[in-house]
Structure formats: C-alpha cells, structure tokens
C-alpha cells in the first residue's frame, strides 16, 4: 500500500488540478435553451461523457461554461428538457444510445428549482441509454416520454430488456413502455426501438425508429409512428432500409402540423430525406445535399455515418426552411428542393463558417428564425444570423471552458517541473498541453487522437497517432509532426493499442492479426518491420 501511494496521483489525499483543455469542447448531444432566462441567453448542454453544464451568455464567445456536478453516478448526458408547465422543473437523460461502446448512463435526473439541485429518479435505474426525451401537455398535465435503447458496455450488450418508449404521467415516479411490438414476424415480440420523438403543433406525438437490438427478421428500423394519446399508436410510414439499422430522425414543422421531415439511414449511409405535407399520409423524396468535403461522397453528406451523424430541425416560423446535419450542415429554404451548405470542417477555402464535423443536434431558439445552436463532436456552436450562413462566416464555436473532451491516452514530458504533455482525444486530435493550470491547448495532430508517446530519454522525439496504424513522429520536441512512421488503416483497431520502449526507442502497435507492428530506431532512422505472434 505504501508503494502504491508513492506513485504520483495515487495518494488518498492528493489534490487534482483541472488542466482543460479550455478551448476544445467535445462530443455533445444534449442542448436546450433555459426558459427561465428572460434575456434568452442561458443554454444548458451535456457532453456524452463529460457531464452537465450551463452558459449564462451563449451569444458571447468569451462566456465560460459552468459545470453542474462532476460526481453524478454517470457523466454521460444525452438529452436535457424543461417542463412545459412548470419551467423550474427539468429532466436530464443519460447514456449515449447511438454509437458502438458509447458512454453508459444510469437513469434520468430531475430538478425542481431551475437547475440548482438535482436528484436521480429511482424509477429510471434501468434506463441506461437514451436516444431522446420530450414532454407533452396532456389534460393540463406534463407527461414525459423517454426513448430508451441498448448498447455495448465492457464487451457486453446491455439494457436490451428495457428498450422502448417510456411514458410517465406522474412527474417521473412511474413509467410504462408504450410502443407496440414490431410485428408478428418478430418471434421475440419486442417493441419498436425509438430513435427520435417530436410533438406537433396539434399536440400529436411522433416517433422515428431504429433497428431493435432484440428479435429477428423485422427488427423495426425505418418506421414512423404517431399517437394522439401516447398510448395507442399508428404506423404512419415504413421506409425501405433492407432490415439494416434504419435510424429515422423526424422533424415536425412547429408552425404547421401537416409538414413533417424525415432523415432516414440505410446500412450506415443516407437512404434519403423525405417530406410530408399531409401529416404523413403521403411522402416525397427530397434532393440530397451535395457535400464536397474531403472524402465525402457527393450523394451522402453523412460520409457513411448516417447511423451516427444525424440531425434535423425546422424553422419555428417557416415550414419550408429546414437544416440538416451529417458531417457538415446544410440549409434549405424551399422545403428541401435545393440545399446550401452552411458549414465546413475541412474545406478552408469555402465561404461559410468552420463548424466541427459530426453533427448530433440542431436547436433553433424558440420563436426565432435567425438564432440556433449546433452540437457535434467539437462541442457547441452558435449563430444569430442564419440568413447569411451560406455566404458568410457567422457561426461561432462557443465552448470556452466546456471541458468535456474525451481522452484515450497521454504522454508526460520527463523533465521535472516542465508542464508539457500530449493527450490523444476522440475526434479532437492529439492535444498539446503546456501550462500547469486550466488553459487552452494547441493541436499537435488532428482527427481522432489515440496513443501517444514522449521518449523519456530523448524527449525531443515524440509520437502521436490517428486511427488504426497511423503514427506520426516529431523530432523537434513536439513543435511539428511531419514524419509518418506508418499509415495503414487496414490493420489494427480504431483506437489502436500501442506501447513504446524508451530504452531501445522502439514503437510496438497492434495489428489485430497474427503479428505486431514494430518500428525500431525512432531517434535515428526509423525502420518498420513486423513480429509474428
């Protein structure tokens, strides 16, 4: 025990200092405007593994986010909603249902004092992954609907028994699964798995589905269902999704209950965008936004990630104005006949704003056609000038002190007292830390950052990585990483395990095959070879 306490950071009385990064942000799905702020500036957001936060002046890029609590049972925030009747009451669902081996949740949290104090609803212990959540007014009462899913946790697919749409008419005390079973061909007799929930202007509730992790034959992906009472459901539409994942995100026009948009995935890719002008009786296929970003097919603006990067929202005042998000953001002002790109993540010469890749949520400010929030793998972005978004840089990154970056690995400089280390993060590159306190970082290498190393005997040599077997070398103390040691995305894992021999200056990495990748002589002339195992 005394030996373990001698390891830096292992003492029971050790004090931890938050280092950031203060300028990066991270994957976010849950965002909402605070209805209790008469100025309309307060926003709540949650990282999918970074906890719950709020910002009192979202229009100010220098306004810092404030964390609510680092010690909830889970920090995986998926959705945040305020009660439509009692605006001091809000609910936060947890667990990221979309994505493989994502952050696991632990239920739904509630506040009745506007977010000062929070407590977990014990009735939701089995709600480990949530895709969506909303509140509908029924007979002058607030009724909560939560879309509960399953996902991998520690190599086990968990929460499958609780998949479904849960309804609570008593403020979260009790819940009832309300969706019907998929169909008689599914011998498991399991309910549809909800992916998205919308409430229309006439108070009808709509659900878009995804493939259920349970059952067989027809797994229920690619459907839209509706209900007038939240209990009895009608299948409105079944899209052709080849029995794949079939995730469907729906967006009902706030100003016109007849107008509904659907964003449909099929076998990972964009299947199509659809629109109905008669409450789902008939549907027309819309044009597909054209994206000319790096490695993005012109006919699939999700770049094969529609199962994951999927967001859609309709202008509160105009049913013909709609925004969709895949890798980037696109806006249509003619009901989906034509689209204009309004963000970029890679094409720096484009005329519109930089917005981080992988869109997960789009949220208009209530009653506003010009102001909106965007949540993605880079955190939170904001604009109050949507009308100019296709021709000007009007969307800002508003993630100051929003410390939700997802790190995989780190490397510490060996020099005593030197505040320098590298850390590889999910979709935010390998970050370079140079300060002993909470501060901004700089990007050493981009994309997804994985394992990284600083040679402990000759620290001017440093290594970063991208996905699979992509490793980069710096020989100038981390100032630049211009040498590629290996770039092979056919072997290894997404975030690929690796280790470094500081004495012999050798990098070893996983290949997911019957050999290891070895790169010798890192501090001189690196040489690549393979070791059979």
Which positions does each model-derived feature cover?
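Beta-propeller blade termini and top-face loops
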Residues: 1-533
């Amino acid at each position: 025990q005394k030996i373990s306490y001698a390891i830096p950071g292992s003492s029971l009385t050790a004090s931890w200092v938050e280092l950031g990064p203060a300028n990066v942000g991270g994957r976010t799905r849950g965002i909402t405007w605070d209805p209790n702020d008469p100025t309309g500036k307060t926003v709540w957001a949650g990282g999918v593994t970074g906890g719950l936060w709020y910002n009192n002046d979202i229009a100010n890029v220098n306004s810092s986010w404030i964390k609510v609590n680092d010690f909830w049972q889970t920090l995986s925030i998926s959705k945040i909603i305020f009660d439509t009747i009692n605006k001091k009451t809000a609910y936060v669902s947890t667990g990221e249902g979309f994505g493989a081996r994502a952050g696991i949740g632990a239920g739904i949290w509630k506040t009745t004092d506007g977010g000062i104090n929070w407590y977990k609803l014990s009735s939701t212990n089995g709600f480990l992954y949530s895709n969506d959540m909303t509140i509908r007014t029924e007979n002058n009462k607030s009724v909560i609907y939560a879309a509960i899913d399953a996902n991998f946790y520690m190599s086990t697919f968990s929460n499958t028994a609780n998949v479904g749409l849960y309804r609570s008419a008593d403020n979260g005390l009790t819940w009832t699964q309300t969706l019907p079973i998929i169909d008689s061909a599914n011998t498991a007799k399991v309910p549809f798995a909800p992916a998205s929930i919308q409430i229309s202007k006439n108070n009808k509730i709509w659900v878009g589905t995804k493939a259920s992790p349970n059952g067989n034959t027809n797994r229920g992906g690619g459907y839209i269902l509706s209900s007038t009472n939240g209990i009895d459901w009608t299948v409105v539409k079944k899209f052709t999704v080849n029995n794949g994942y079939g995730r469907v995100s729906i967006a009902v026009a706030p100003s016109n209950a007849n107008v509904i948009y659907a964003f449909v995935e099929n076998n990972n890719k964009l299947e199509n965008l659809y629109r109905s002008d008669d409450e789902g009786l008939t549907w027309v296929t819309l044009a597909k936004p054209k994206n000319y970003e790096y490695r993005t097919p012109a006919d699939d603006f999700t770049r094969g990630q529609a199962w994951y990067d999927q967001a859609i929202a309709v202008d509160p005042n105009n049913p013909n104005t709609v925004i969709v998000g895949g890798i980037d953001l696109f806006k249509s002002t003619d009901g989906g006949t034509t689209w204009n790109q309004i963000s970029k993540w890679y094409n720096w010469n484009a005329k519109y704003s930089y917005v981080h890749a992988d869109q997960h949520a789009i949220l208009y400010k209530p009653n506003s056609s010009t102001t909106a929030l965007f949540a993605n793998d880079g955190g939170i972005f904001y604009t109050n000038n949507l009308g100019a978004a296709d021709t000007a840089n009007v969307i800002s990154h508003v993630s100051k002190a929003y410390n939700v970056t997802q790190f995989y690995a780190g490397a510490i400089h060996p020099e005593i007292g030197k505040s320098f280390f590298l850390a590889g993060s999910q979709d935010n590159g390998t970050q370079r830390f140079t300060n002993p306190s909470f501060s901004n970082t700089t990007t050493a290498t981009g994309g997804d950052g994985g394992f990284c190393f600083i040679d402990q005997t000759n620290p001017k040599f440093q290594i970063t990585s991208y996905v699979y077997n992509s490793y980069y070398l710096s020989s100038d103390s981390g100032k630049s990483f211009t040498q590629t040691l290996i770039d092979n995305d056919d072997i290894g894992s997404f975030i690929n395990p690796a280790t470094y021999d500081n004495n012999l200056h050798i990098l070893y990495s996983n290949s997911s095959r019957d050999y290891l990748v070895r790169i010798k002589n890192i501090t001189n002339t690196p040489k690549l070879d393979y070791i059979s195992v």
